[in-house]
Amino acid sequence: KVSFSVGEVTGNGKWSAKDDKFSLTIEGEEMVGTIGENNISFDDMLGMGVKVIFAKEGTDAMDPARYLTKEEKVVIGEWAAESVEELLGDGPQTSMEGVENISDALRLNFKDDRNVAVVYKGEEIGTFPWSVAMGYCMIESENPSLSVTINDDDTLKVDYSDDEDYYTFHCVKSDSK
């Protein structure tokens, strides 16, 4: 028997294992996963198109960095503004009031633990959770609001807004890692 819960949704079911396959039936919905070293992965959990990996507690399999997607790996690292554009401005600018160097206007340091440190105009704003889907990076922050598009040339377009400012930054990955 198995008990299953995701958020407030719960269910009961049965499981079985044979060779490297793990069968799980919850509330009549059957899923087949693959047994790995210290984990079990389901490519299409509950028919929702979502890959879910269960890791054995206390093992390296618990490290989320092991399961980064290609899109997520693109954003990992330090990024800095190369240009900035005001909402009603004259196009991209390479200087900005309040900073000596445009790269200090916005810096993003995406970590493999899925948190990003945000520095705006040289001041650390905070560290926020992030996720990537379909070419966009969502940063879980309301103020400032950060909307990130991953460009085809592996640069980032970042829309930044807070109570006072609204800018679009074009960011490049820093040379230093």
Please give the residue ranges for each predicted region:
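Lipid interaction determinants
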Residues: 1-129, 133-177
